[in-house]
UniProtKB/Swiss-Prot annotation:
Glycans are attached at N36, N107, N176, N189, N238, N441. SUPFAM superfamilies: Apical membrane antigen 1. This is Merozoite receptor PK66. Keywords: Glycoprotein, Malaria, Membrane, Signal, Transmembrane, Transmembrane helix. The chain crosses the membrane at residues 488-508. InterPro entries: Apmem_Ag1, Apmem_Ag1_dom_sf.
């Protein structure tokens, strides 16, 4: 059996060494650095071709299609049924800072309760009507008092608590409905408002009347980010409790959004340029152009204002629905943006330009003259701290990671593998073949290496693609090696198993043969071998002789019984 173990041990060693060879033979994953090719005595410095992005984690909250996943300017991204009626309700996962609803030609705030009873239609707003149980508006202090026995709710921040409060109420006529009311939180007054109406826009002479004198006509309204709404935060039922980690709030100072292109953050080439006098104005512009779920097809006529007014007075949702969510919204034009739109902008504070675009940014460019903003962001709040060490830290992490891999898998351990990062505050760390260029308008004292050939480029629609001549390195680069290695391992493993099984049978049979051979041999019981052999073969020998002897029929020792 020791031979079997020896064979298995040698086979395992063979597989281990084959794995090491396979890793060391991946020459396509590394490129020799030009300025270090002549270093024979020192460590070999090579450049990885893996295009990792050091901004990946930082930029996750700015991927608004994933983080918010619904309209921003108009958020009607979810359907809900109440009884036999279908409604569209807000569904965004992030707060929208500075968003409010403007009622045209009216001094009534949208945070005013809707008109009920004898009130005329335009005397009311969008907020929840007064009720016996005072649930809206309600201050954060009163909310905390209301839910003081609920430990989980007491852990929430003010915005999450307001959202949770509004979403906790279910319509009495349908307890199983997923319909929930949106909310608005006033950060200045620390007050939470539940909204009775989910609609955010109703415009055009066919659907509303801007005439302020016609108090019974349906009012026109639209979303906006004006100065009056700076302290407001628009909330859907789906806003994450940990939105601070998943959603943007502050604008980014000394920065502009860019695209990560093989080792450096580059300008977004295809943008829409708009005049803007301030960051606030640029933020308002990008909000107006942002993702919208507003339906574009309505029914032919909407003239029964008396019916609409009666709907408010009687709290009849079917009548209200016909005004705010017309029939066409649920037919061919039930549009859901899923967060896709012109959601990002770079504001040039020197030239007063606002550059808006609909491509998800993947990095930040350090520029003291710019601000990066989103349609979700606060109109004024700014974070001026640029993460200057992000490149240097990532280079150090990647080198340590590659060093560990070299120690595990490389025969030649005298190698340093550099990541494809060609910008840093430490110009020595990027190992540039030429003199790195100093970025003059950077607040972080960055150096960039521009003489290394890029393996990727920006094409139309701001799409980053790998250049044609390098595609072979990135089209499942490990797939062929892994497939080949897998076949080799399967073959070797199969051969080892066959050899092991054959060896097992061979040694087991040999062991049995040896055992029976020993049984056939004479054993020393005080007599010579020849004497015992003669006794065993002599049929006249006494079976119960006085001396002990082996049986000639069985391999056991028999003795004379005593009675």
């Amino acid at each position: 059996m020791n031979k079997i173990y020896y064979i298995l041990f040698l086979s395992a060693q063979c597989l281990v060494h084959m794995g090491k060879c396979e890793r060391n033979q991946k020459t396509t994953r590394l490129t020799r650095s030009a300025n270090n090719a002549s270093l024979e005595k020192g460590p070999i410095i090579e450049r990885s071709i893996r295009m990792s992005n050091p901004w990946k984690a930082f930029m996750e909250k700015y991927d608004l299609e994933r983080a918010h996943n619904s309209g921003i300017r108009i958020d009607l991204g979810e359907d809900a049924e109440v009884g036999n009626s279908k409604y569209r309700i807000p569904a965004g996962k992030c707060p929208v800072f500075g968003k409010g609803i403007v009622i045209e030609n009216s001094n009534v705030s949208f945070l005013t309760p809707v008109a009920t009873g004898a009130q005329r239609l335009k005397e009311g707003g969008f907020a929840f009507p007064n009720a016996d149980d005072h649930i809206s508006p309600i201050t954060i202090a009163n909310l905390k008092e209301r839910y003081k026995e609920n430990a989980d709710l007491m852990k929430l921040n003010d915005i999450a608590l307001c959202k949770t409060h509004a979403a906790s109420f279910v319509i009495a006529e349908d307890q199983n409905t997923s319909y929930r009311h949106p909310a608005v939180y006033d950060e200045k007054n620390k007050t939470c408002y539940m909204l009775y109406l989910s609609a955010q826009e109703n415009m055009g002479p066919r659907y509303c009347s801007p005439d302020s004198q016609n108090k019974d006509a349906m009012f026109c309204f639209k979303p906006d980010k004006n100065e009056n709404f700076d302290n407001l935060v628009y909330l859907s039922k789906n806003v994450s409790n940990d939105w601070e980690n998943k959603c943007p709030r502050k604008n980014l100072g000394n920065a502009k959004f860019g695209l990560w292109v093989d080792g450096n953050c580059e300008e977004i080439p295809y943008v829409n340029e708009v005049e803007a006098r301030s960051l606030r104005e640029c933020n308002r512009i990008v909000f107006e152009a942002s993702a919208s779920d507003q339906p574009r097809q309505y029914e032919e006529e909407l003239t029964d204002y008396e019916k609409i007014q009666e709907g408010f007075r009687q709290n009849n949702r079917d009548m209200i629905k016909s005004a705010f969510l017309p029939v066409g919204a649920f037919n061919s034009d039930n549009f859901k943006s899923k967060g896709r739109g012109y959601n990002w902008a770079n504001f040039d504070s020197v030239n007063n330009k606002c550059y808006i675009f609909n491509t998800k940014p993947t990095c930040l460019i350090n520029d003291k003259n710019f601000f990066a903003t989103t349609a979700l962001s606060h109109p004024q709040e700014v974070d001026n701290e640029f993460p200057c060490s992000i490149y240097k830290d990532e280079i150090e992490r990647e080198i340590k990671k590659q060093s560990r891999n070299m120690n595990l898998y490389s025969v030649d351990k005298e190698r340093i593998v550099l990541p494809r990062i060609f910008i840093s505050t430490d110009k020595e760390s990027i190992k540039c073949p030429c003199e790195p260029e100093h970025i003059s308008n950077s607040t972080c004292n960055f150096y960039v290496c521009n003489c290394v050939e890029k393996r990727a480029e920006i094409k139309e629609n701001n799409e980053v693609i790998i250049k044609e001549e390098f595609k072979e390195d990135y089209e499942n680069p490990d797939g062929k090696h892994k497939k080949k290695m897998l076949l080799i391992i399967i073959g070797v493993t199969g051969a080892v198993c066959v050899v092991a099984v054959a060896s097992l049978f061979y040694f087991r049979k040999k062991a049995q043969d040896d055992k029976y051979d020993k049984m056939d041999q004479a054993e020393a019981y005080g007599k010579t071998a020849n004497t015992r052999k003669d006794e065993m073969l002599d049929p006249e020998a006494s079976f119960w002789g006085e001396d002990k002897r082996a049986s000639h029929t069985t391999p056991v020792l028999m003795e004379k019984p005593y009675y």
